[in-house]
Amino acid sequence: MNRQLFVCNSVYQVLVAMWIKYIYHQREVSDLIISDHMNGAKTLTENIKKTGIFDQVYYVESSAFARHKILFDRKQRIMMSMCPQHVLKNFVKLNAKYTELYMANVDFFSQLLFDALAHQYSRLKLIIFEDGLFTYSRLYEEDYKST
């Protein structure tokens, strides 16, 4: 069974992730990570949990890491490349095995997350989604297929 993990750094990305979930993965289990890259991220996380759209919703403080503000010594860099899942636990403890990872930004945290999940499931699909909501509309899909 497929299980998706969405990573969102903005309110609009959360909206797009909800739309993708609703249109393409309505009957599948999907989880969501909301990062501290935006104001009000904790409140947004709690509100999204209440909707029940996603099975698990995680709040992650990753902005300093994503923006290179955390410096690593040689041992830590080796640990990140050899055991990324161990380093990931400093940010979020994920309890599932994912088949698909959706993200709109590629930064240090996203790379760490992908590496850690790929260690668990070697056929992990990485899907980079864009912020354009219309792209995921059935109307757009029908129009695209007709041309």
Region roles according to the model:
Residues L5-T147:
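Active-site and donor-binding regions of nucleotide-sugar-utilizing enzymes
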Residues M1-R3:
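Short, Lys/Arg-enriched, disordered terminal segments
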